[in-house]
Amino acid sequence: IALILPVNFNNPERMMKEADHVREDKFWCPVAHPSPMEPHVCVGQWETFTDKITIWSSSQAPFKLREALAKTLKMDLNNIRVIKMATGGGFGGKLEMLPMDFSACLLSKKAGGLPVKIVLTREEEFTTTRRKHGMIYKVKTGVKKDGTIMAMTGEVLADGGAYCSYGPTVLAAAM
């Protein structure tokens, strides 16, 4: 279990008792793999004389990418510059830190500071990037005869996979 996040507003138990009708539903959203027209792409350049990195990335989380590069490569945050290119389609699929971002920078260092560009193929998009979480929603809603919603309670179960990563963030947004 990666996250248990109770969210409470007012007193749903009392409000359910005041409702004229109570309905319980269960919804299932299957696993999905974002498939934007634009694949993941990055260009990394390790400036060998200054020992600084510049990376151009289609990441949806450029500041997280910068932090991850600094931590992984044991570098000062100020020595890493992330330039966010146009993401194009992302649908949450470009939030992850991918090995290609790190690889482009390290390959650039090995190439004497020349920029290294990595573009994933469609097949690589499906085999090396994350899918979006499948979720089961259990929802109980209490309403008045006039349609006024009095209360709603729910539970969301998400399959974050073996390496949950942004799973808790996605689950919190689902609530």
Regions found by a protein language model. Give the residues of each.
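Structural alpha/beta core scaffold segments of enzyme domains
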Residues: 1-175
